[in-house]
Amino acid sequence: MFDDTPIERESMEFDVVIVGAGGAGLCAAIRLKQLEEETGKEISVVVVEKGSEVGAHILSGAVLDPRALDELLPDWRDDEACPIDTPVTSEKFLYLGQSGSMPLPNAFLPKSLKNHGCYAVSMANTCRWLAEKAEAMGVEIYPMMAASRLVRSDDGRVRGVIVGEVGIGRDGNPKDSYEPGMELLGKYTLLAEGVRGSLSKQVIQEFALDRDSDVQKYGIGLKELWKVPDENFKKGFVQHTFGWPLTDDVGGGSWMYHFGDNYVSIGLVVHLGYKNPWIAPYQEFQRFKTHPEIEIGRASCRER
């Protein structure tokens, strides 16, 4: 690991440093700039993103509840550039058997599984749109800037992050090709890295932020994005399932969203607590796509 010898780095100072240009980080940046307008006090904000561009590491196709967006950007529906344009028009929640299915009545579902008033979206495109909004308000966004470590003061406070640090070996020691990167310092540092972010894990462990939390559940998700012909496209249709091809002792479920210009986002999530060593999530996903509830879409996709 690194010794205690100080490393000289260039640095830049901001009021707020945000790590991660996903939905949370970008919305936070926009809100800070709104506060700047409301108070008349300048707030400098920088967002660093490890992907080659905003959206490059956003894999989710999602059903978006617009309530928070309504509060943040009340006029978003009037923006012709906004990619959030597919309201949920119909939905199913199914239990799958090998060759059939059983719908669960909507009245029996918890509110979190009801999608009326929501939108089927590409989160990658949504984040790109949010980034344009943020930059127009004066937020600085730096893609291809992975934050590798926190910058700490002598008393342990977080002062910012180190970005652009390369040439670190697997043992944690610098190699001959080591480049120290630079420091982005802020009065406040916001970690919006998403699930299992490397800096977030450090902070969670150090400050025991998960002390009163339930044990984390892990799963692997497999996703495909299809382009289907008009006869197989139901814009605004959302479907979630559980059951086949997973067995009773393997948790998980699936989604299918019809959105945009004849796009279908489809995927399967398999909880990683399964005990059968022969379970192969990718192969289960291939089996899942043969089910009658989605097979017609698969065939159409193949024809394209």
Indicate where each model-derived feature is located.
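Residue-level detector of conserved catalytic or cofactor/ligand-binding positions
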Residues: 295-303
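Predominantly flavin-linked oxidoreductase catalytic cores and closely associated redox partners
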Residues: 31, 39-41, 124, 128-129, ...
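Glycine/serine-rich loop-strand microenvironments at binding/catalytic pocket rims
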Residues: 1-19, 23, 138-142
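N-terminal Rossmann-like FAD-binding beta1-loop-alpha1 element of flavoenzymes
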Residues: 16-46
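Extended hydrophobic secondary-structure segments that form protein cores and membrane-embedded regions
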Residues: 16, 44-52, 186-190
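Conserved Rossmann-like nucleotide-cofactor binding loop
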Residues: 24, 53, 196
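Glycine-rich Rossmann-fold phosphate-binding loop(s) that bind the pyrophosphate
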Residues: 21-22, 50, 123
